[in-house]
Swiss-Prot record:
GO biological process, any: galactose metabolic process
The protein's name: Galactokinase
Binding, ATP: G158, G160, S162, S163, S250, K252
EC category: transferase
SUPFAM superfamilies to which the protein is assigned, alphabetical: GHMP Kinase, C-terminal domain (SSF55060), Ribosomal protein S5 domain 2-like (SSF54211)
Domain of life: Eukaryota
Presence of keyword ATP-binding: yes
Entries under Pfam families matching the protein: GalKase_gal_bdg, GHMP_kinases_C, GHMP_kinases_N
Source organism per UniProt: Dictyostelium discoideum (Social amoeba)
Length: 501
């Protein structure tokens, strides 16, 4: 891969080109080297790869309905050191620097046909998903080289900042690179999206796309249709985005049947019923965006149509949807429930889910447009007083959109929880202009918009009013505060790291 080709993942020779927190991350790579040598009998890594976690500013649970999102990459990442396994061509060895994650040596002679046991959740399933995806992507079914892998990650697990996707993405990058499969960033993102579905999560694509396509100092507006496109969004000056982990675990693959995957199905059923009531070719509809495209509707019209056709009877059973469409329940499930994915619910909330998706998408576009106007204003106006006044108004409007987003996530999409609702309320009461859950929800993190001058006092207040009151002290005992409560800026996407670290 060419480090000078912007379409391909870059090859980075110095860690300070990636990390602001250079010293701590240097120690991570040194530990990775030392541990690798111990595990693999003196063998040295020949490649290093890293892929970041992400935070979504706004646009929750809309990507799998075909709509745009606005994330940026975190500095926190998953890194992997790699060497070739010269002892056995059919075995890959998977280890982690954190002893909590037990190692596995896995026979991969089946290549792309390797089976992943989704009933037994193990962290190596994500690595196998990447292996399966890359193996299937190889031309003419070429056999992948077996490898020794050692991972190190500091993306908080179960926090809604894409630790699992970072693991899939870094594995996809590592395995493809080691097998001379040259893929650009978009292709790697698409392959990672496909691969992560092998572990039983119907991913919408945001997490993998930003992990590969992120750039320093800019958020990305990501559109998925008609093709994957990204647009830089410069964030306003004078404020910080602060991440606070509720410390309620949010594990999509574990709770998907009643949470994440259920919402995917509800959005699909909402789309097909809306298309049916609008007289469209509903048989071809799979996403809410398909209704917009086929009917040539704008978002306000879609919100009105949702009120008109879905609000009277908000909850449906499989049998009721099948009867309306004049198809069997078996055909409904086969067509609109993603294959290989379990959903545990007899009732499906369609009105609330559709209304959230359409209004949340409006907020994404408003948020990015406000940021664009602010950036253009600052570039064309040198009057400091005007700049200051304009920036204050901009920030307040962005905060309002974030608050509206959380309200919709909580009340319409019902992907919040009592701890997240309490935490966002505490954040607003202690200096945040806007605060919302970020990620899948049902636990995990909130993101808050905080004036730079108030960040330190804000973090202290959250410690006092949330962590000290709502979190078991035993849970905090072995965790550094900076790992669950911190401010962040947009960071670099996935890359290859020179073996000379």
């Amino acid at each position: 891969m060419d480090s000078f080709n912007p379409a391909l993942p870059s090859i980075v020779e110095s860690l300070d080109d990636i990390y602001k927190n250079f010293e701590n991350n240097k120690k991570r790579y040194e530990e990775l080297n030392e541990t690798f040598s111990k595990i693999y009998n003196g063998d040295k890594p020949i490649f290093y790869f890293r892929a970041p976690g992400r935070v979504n500013l706004i646009g929750e649970h809309v990507d799998y309905s075909g709509y745009c999102v606005l994330p940026f990459a975190l500095e926190q990442d998953t890194i992997v050191a790699v060497s070739f396994n010269k002892l056995n061509n059919d075995i890959i060895n998977i280890h982690n620097c954190n002893e909590k994650y037990t190692p596995k040596s896995i026979d991969v002679s089946g290549g792309g046909d390797i089976e992943i046991d989704m009933k037994r959740h193990h962290w190596t399933n994500y690595v196998l998903a990447a292996w399966k995806g890359v193996s299937q992507a190889m031309e003419k079914g070429g056999k992948l080289k077996s490898v020794n892998l050692l991972y190190s990650g500091n993306v908080p697990m179960g926090a809604g900042v894409s630790s699992s996707s970072a693991l899939v993405c870094v594995s996809t990058l590592a395995i493809s690179y080691c097998n001379n499969l040259i893929l650009n960033k978009e292709e790697l993102a698409q392959l990672s999206i496909k691969s992560e579905r092998y572990v039983g999560v119907e991913s919408g694509g945001m997490d993998q796309s930003i992990s590969f396509l992120a750039e320093q100092n800019t958020a990305k507006l990501i559109e998925f249709h008609p093709s994957l496109k990204t647009f830089d969004v410069q964030l306003p000056k004078g404020v910080s985005f602060v991440i606070c982990n509720s410390l309620v675990d949010s594990l999509k693959v574990v709770t998907g049947a009643t949470n994440y995957n259920l919402r995917v199905v509800e959005c699909r059923l909402a789309a097909v019923l809306l298309a049916f009531h609008c007289g469209l070719s509903w048989e071809k509809v799979r996403r809410l965006r398909d209704v917009q495209y086929q009917g040539n509707f704008d978002l306000p019209q879609l919100i009105q149509l949702t009120e008109q056709h879905l609000s009277e009877k908000q909850t449906y059973t499989r049998e009721e949807v099948a009867t309306i469409l004049d198809i069997s329940v078996e055909q409904l499930v086969k067509t609109y429930f993603p294959s290989g994915i379990t959903v545990q619910s007899e009732h499906f909330e369609l009105y609330k889910r559709a209304r959230h998706v359409f209004t949340e998408t409006q907020r994404v576009y408003k948020f990015s447009e406000i940021c664009k106007q602010q950036s253009n204003f600052n570039n064309n106006n040198n009057n400091n007083n005007n700049n200051s006044s304009n920036n204050t108004n901009i920030i307040q409007e962005l905060g309002k959109l974030m608050n509206e987003s959380h309200e919709s996530c909580s009340k319409l999409f019902e992907c919040s929880c009592s701890e997240l609702d309490s935490l966002t309320k505490i954040c607003r009461e202690n200096g945040a202009l806007g605060s919302r859950l970020t990620g899948a929800g049902w636990g995990g993190c909130v993101i808050s918009l905080v004036p730079n001058s108030k960040v330190d006092s804000f973090l202290d207040a959250i410690d006092t009013h949330y962590y000290s009151k709502f979190v078991n002290p035993e849970k905090l005992k072995n965790i550094e505060k900076s790992s669950y409560s911190f401010f962040t800026t947009p960071c670099k996407g996935a890359c290859i790291v020179s073996s000379t670290v």
